[in-house]
Every structure is written in structure tokens, then in C-alpha cells.
Design a protein with these regions (language model features):
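Short amphipathic alpha-helical segments
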Residues: 2-3, 26, 100-103, 141-143, ...
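Helix-loop-beta segment of a Rossmann-like dinucleotide-binding subdomain
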Residues: 24-39, 65, 72-75, 125, ...
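A Rossmann-like FAD-binding core segment of flavoenzymes
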Residues: 44, 50-69, 75-77, 82-83, ...
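Conserved N-terminal glycine-rich FAD pyrophosphate-binding loop of Rossmann-like flavoproteins
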Residues: 4, 17-41, 165-172
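Rossmann-like dinucleotide/flavin-binding elements
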Residues: 1-17, 108, 114-163
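FAD-binding core/adjacent interface of flavoenzyme oxidoreductases
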Residues: 13, 57-126
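Glycine/Thr-rich phosphate-binding loops of Rossmann-like dinucleotide-binding domains
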Residues: 23, 98-99, 204
Length: 211
């Protein structure tokens, strides 16, 4: 948005708290000419290109309050700055909310991910655990099956799968575990196994989960 507006010679302030969704990952994927770049490299290149347009400026800050109405807004930030503007564009994106599972924080962004389109290639043909339940289970099973045939679904204690959903997963030889997850065991950020409360240990080298 800042690039397009800068090229249109509009005065723009980008208020950015420098905590993007993908900050925990080592690489970003799916962007032509930037596939495999780290999030920091990607943002650095983006800012350098946008900085060539003199009407765009960046503020490493967080907006805390907006007052006024269309054509005359005031934006205040945590650092005490105040900006007057005619228009406001929200480009806040999404935030992943990791599940409350022991050991997930240590592997999140290294060998445990949310998006198979973003990180599935790197885990292709590996043994994976998919932490998901309900309608999302069938969707994730279809998506993951294109990356690997070796995957297991853990519902983490949820009993939201219908008999029809379980039967369809069974037809595709997908094993489903219903017990709550006790922990995700890892070494240096790489998943080794997922352990359930009933003592079942599922060896794997990667995890996908749905917040």
C-alpha cells in the first residue's frame, strides 16, 4: 500500500511496531524474487525500495488511539507522536495464537508451523503430526497429503470430529489420536516426537497446527 501511494505522490506515514506475523520463521516463501529470504531480509528490501519515494516515511511505533472523522483524523502513538491525516488504512495482517502445549514455543517457526503452503515444501516426505480438529481436520489432511503421505492427526482432546469425518480419514489411511497432548519434545528447535497424556509417543520431524 505504501509503495502504491508513494508512487501516486501521496503523503504517507507507515506506523509499524516491527513485530510481523512471520518474525519467528527463518525463511519466507511464496513471493516471486524473494522466495527463501528471511523475514528481516524481505522487510529490509521492501523499505529500501519504498524509501526512494520522498512522500513516504516510516515510524517504528504503535498506534494507540484514533480520533476525529473522515477527512480529519488524529492518530496518537505509544511514543507520544501525533499525526493528522485525511485517511487511515489498516494493514495489520494476522497474528498466530500458538496453542497452549508444552514445548510448542521451542519449535514454533523452526519445525512447527501454521501454514502448509508457506512451509510444507521444506517438510515434504517427512513424518508429520497435524494438530487440528473438526472440519479443519479434513481440509488439512487434503492439503498435507500433497506434501507427504506420512502424517498423523492429533485432536488434542477435542471430540469434534463426526463419525463421517473419521470414516473419511480412515479411508485415506490417516491415523487419528484423540488424547490431549502432553508435550512436544525437541532438540535445538527440531521436533522429535509428540507425547500424549495416555503415554503414546508419536515420532515426527515436523508439526502443523491450527490456532
Amino acid at each position: 500500500a505504501a509503495l502504491v501511494l508513494g508512487r501516486a505522490r501521496k503523503n504517507v506515514v507507515v506506523i509499524d511496531d516491527e513485530t510481523p506475523r512471520n518474525w519467528v520463521t527463518r525463511e519466507t516463501h511464496g513471493f516471486v524474487t524473494r522466495d527463501g529470504a528471511s523475514p528481516r531480509e524481505f522487510r529490509k528490501a521492501a523499505k529500501e525500495q519504498i524509501a526512494t519515494y520522498p512522500t513516504v516515511q516510516f515510524a517504528s511505533d504503535t498506534a494507540t488511539a484514533i480520533t476525529g472523522s473522515d477527512g480529519d483524523f488524529e492518530v496518537k502513538t505509544t511514543q507520544g507522536a501525533s499525526y493528522r491525516t485525511k485517511k487511515i488504512l489498516f494493514a495489520v495482517g494476522n497474528k498466530d495464537l500458538p496453542l497452549d502445549i508444552n514445548g510448542l514455543t521451542e519449535v514454533y517457526g523452526k519445525s512447527a508451523f501454521v501454514c502448509p503452503y508457506c512451509d510444507g515444501w521444506e517438510l515434504r516426505d517427512q513424518s508429520l503430526v497435524i494438530i487440528v480438529s473438526g472440519d479443519k481436520a479434513l481440509h488439512m489432511a487434503k492439503v498435507i497429503s500433497g506434501r507427504t503421505e506420512r502424517y498423523t492427526i492429533c485432536t488434542n482432546g477435542s471430540d469434534s470430529l463426526t463419525d463421517e469425518q473419521r470414516e473419511e480419514l480412515k479411508r485415506h489411511n490417516v491415523t487419528v489420536f484423540n488424547a490431549p497432548i502432553q508435550s512436544i519434545n525437541s532438540e535445538e528447535g527440531m521436533v522429535q516426537q509428540v507425547v500424549l497424556n495416555d503415554g503414546t509417543a508419536i515420532p515426527c520431524t515436523g508439526v502443523f497446527f491450527q490456532p
